Amino acid sequence: QPVKIQETGFLGKRPMADAGGSVALVRGGALGDFILTLPLIRALRDNFPRSRLVLVGDPSTTRLGGAAERVSAEAGDWARMYTQDGPPPTLADQFADCRLLVALLPGGPGAAPDVYLENLRALCTQMRVGDSQPEPGQTRHMTQRLLDPLRDEGIDLPDAPQPRIELPSAPAKGDVVILHPGSGGRHKCWPAQHFVTLLAWLQRQGWQVAVLWGPAEEARRGEFPPALSEAATQLCPASAWELALYLAAAKFYIGNDTGPGHVAAAVGCPTLSLFGPTDPRLWRPLGPAARVVQAPACDLERLGVGTVIDATAEALANLEASDEPVEH
């Protein structure tokens, strides 16, 4: 029989008493997807302060969610969640006191394998499944969409959720401008030669520029113009945490619609994100000084370098004119 997910609130439309135990979040997806989930993690932490938080996903990424127990979604134990064998004893023990499990799955409960949902429910009967993808015609930001599993459950939620990455100590701010010319999807990349022109303009203005390479484009760095792939300062962070530290110390970040842009905004780094085929109303980075330039007709080939230079010049001028640092 197909697994039936309760459409009414399993919390009875009243706040659940915080009696300890644990609360859990299952979240796959790329780096930027996880960053947009940080408001949900904060809501769980704020509403269940006496409960342990368990994060299931990529441990390198979930580290950005703060103090928590981490379960690798790629490890052998979790892989068994997709089989008829049921949850392995190690997971059953870890989730024995789980009072609430939120799972964000592509397509929501209707698209997930029944056996997987059955095994999640075996870990925690108090389960809510949310859709990690936009709904048709959606215009609200994805941070709001990802809070839907909690929205009608009497749990306090922020009116304007904003992802925040809490670093134990803020790195000293420098005068480095970070450029990120890559992306996990080439269709989301502004032409590399435009980044070369932008880099040269920044250097003429006296800025120190670093070029950031993530795992998505590291293997094909040689495809980029030498002015980018052989720039004096290259940043190749070994982890999402190291990436966050680099960005927290930067003066400004300019890049495509990618995960690092969301990380930059979440650590309080002023950002300029270049959007093409994706809708910034849903996916733009959220931060105290996060800006977006949308390509004409959603085509990054038509986004002129002059437009981006003008937006960069305005943002940097505002930063220079401000006596106060941007607050996280």
Region roles according to the model:
Residues 1-328:
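Catalytic machinery of carbohydrate-active enzymes
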